[in-house]
Amino acid sequence: MDSGFQLAYLRDRQLSSVRRAASGSHSRTELYLKVLLVAIFLPEGLSFFVGDFRLSVARVLIFVSSIAAISRLSSARAVVCVPSDILAPVAGVWMMFAATITGGLTGLKGAGIDAIVFTGGYLTFRYLTPGDSSVRLARFSCMLAVLIVCIALLDPWNDKLFTYEFIKGITGYVKFSYEGALATKAETLYREGVIRAMGPLEHSILFGAVCAWFGTVALITFRSQVFGWAVAGIALIGVLFSQARSPLLAYLIGFALAMFYVATPRFTARWKLVGLCVTAIVVTVFTFSGNPVVTLVRLCGVSPEAAWYRQAIWQVGGRVVLGSPIFGIGANGDWDWQSNGALLSESVDAFWLANAMAYGIPGSILVLLTIVGACWLGSIDKSRHLTPEEGRLSVALGVVITTIVFLGFMVHFWGICLILIAVFAGMRANLAETAVLRDRAARAAETWV
């Protein structure tokens, strides 16, 4: 054979072997991420202790994968910097630093877990997600959400917390807050005498939020398929059986934004318009309303009783934050919730307020900026280097992040939901990087041609 032909043949063989090796590595990584997604939804009763730390399978996997993500980041590869890439580690460091200031070593132990699952969850899905697997992971997550809904519906079907009782029978795990609420048929677990669907989640509101999020992802990403509408419909059933109004509102917001997205294919400034409208409403309410939190919550369709309860939480919690604005009072800090007769417990039903109380205003802002910063590179759904489903997934994740920010003012997210928030942000940032890197590769190819 001609020497030039032989050289080209050998190069092609070498490139083919490299591609096969990379493909195998990507498939293993994708499988690991799917296993991690399953582990995230394992019930709390399957957690275990290592020393003073209560760990779950998901926490252990996130800790391991975050190390792998940092290692991959330090290797020589093309990286596109998204603001959340910097903000996520800073948020984790601040959580641990603030908790150490307020609670010493004990505070550090508790905050360290939150920092690992939030920052580690972000890093894992930001840097370990293979460039062509985002849609497959989203599809798998939606199928997993359908399974979670089916399991959760066993709660009202059997008139008991089926998953909790099942795991308790195996491991002996008892959660006294559940036992007390079950004994008294408290509203936290019952509505109109019917038990609220919860499944493996820590609370029915969190279950409803998860249904709203994955229903939105399915509806937007797979809108042209029966799969997308089926998942969205099943997710709505889950929201309704959670008997929680806030997740229902999130679902309706997601549906409305999805329809707006479909109806305005050529209107590139659509999200700026939505942002301006929301900003105008918020500014108007805070300018002219004597009880802005109540007004906003009532505008969202929440009952007057719930609206006034959240107003009381913000009034008392706000004073706590202003008393220690930089470092907060710690995740387990005592606060004078009894000073307001409307409050029934020390539970803070507002994610942003709870973070500010635990880690100070900077801690809450850093978490907020992390998830918002994942969308900082702007709309990428029209990128000619993303597939149509990848483009729609980027929009879906942006809508989900919007509902998270909104619900964070009247719902507290912890446990499984806290991890999922980091996962959504990491996937959105990964998609943005994929679009930029493919664009660079295309430009380089055009240059060589």
Predicted regions and their residues:
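Loop-to-helix entry and N-terminal half of a specific, functionally important transmembrane alpha helix
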Residues: 32-40, 276, 377-410
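N-terminal hydrophobic segments of proteins, predominantly signal-anchor/transmembrane helices
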Residues: 28-48, 59-123, 401-405, 449
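Interfacial loop-to-transmembrane-helix boundary motif in multi-pass membrane proteins
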Residues: 28-33, 83-91, 124-173
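Long extracytoplasmic/lumenal interhelical loops at the membrane interface
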Residues: 48, 292-362, 378-385
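Alpha-helical transmembrane segments of multi-pass inner-membrane proteins
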Residues: 138-162, 169-243, 248-261
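Transmembrane alpha-helices of multi-pass inner-membrane enzymes
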Residues: 64-68, 395-449
